[in-house]
Amino acid sequence: GEMDQHDIERMDYIHMELPRFRLFKDAWRYVEGFNTSIASTCQSHHVMEHRFLGRYSMGWNVGAGPSVIGTHIHPDLDQWYIILPGGSMTYTADGESTHVSEGDVTYTGMNTPHGSEIAADEKINYFWVECAINGYAS
């Protein structure tokens, strides 16, 4: 989307050269509270961290099943998953489940409960993009 006043002010404050991102191999690892059950089998990475490119952030999740990504919401973020080669899982959003695999793209609007299940013979491998469409609440 177009840059709004928040984006312009943030870019001016950061004083960075674009693009500000990292290669997958150099990405920052993180674990979220709802993902504690997958910490040993799946890895979550930030490729471009929140708030540094205005309202956008990007990352990558990879690992093996069986596993579960607990149901959670993002109050400020719309989110897209792009399923990468070898990736396969059951994705649930707002109570509806669908099986996704390589080449599929999901969209989840802000405040929508969502999570995933990865079967024993599946792998999680997806790139995510998030955007705080209306800016961040805090």
Predicted segments, located by residue:
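Conserved short histidine dyad/triad with adjacent acidic residue
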Residues: 56-75, 88
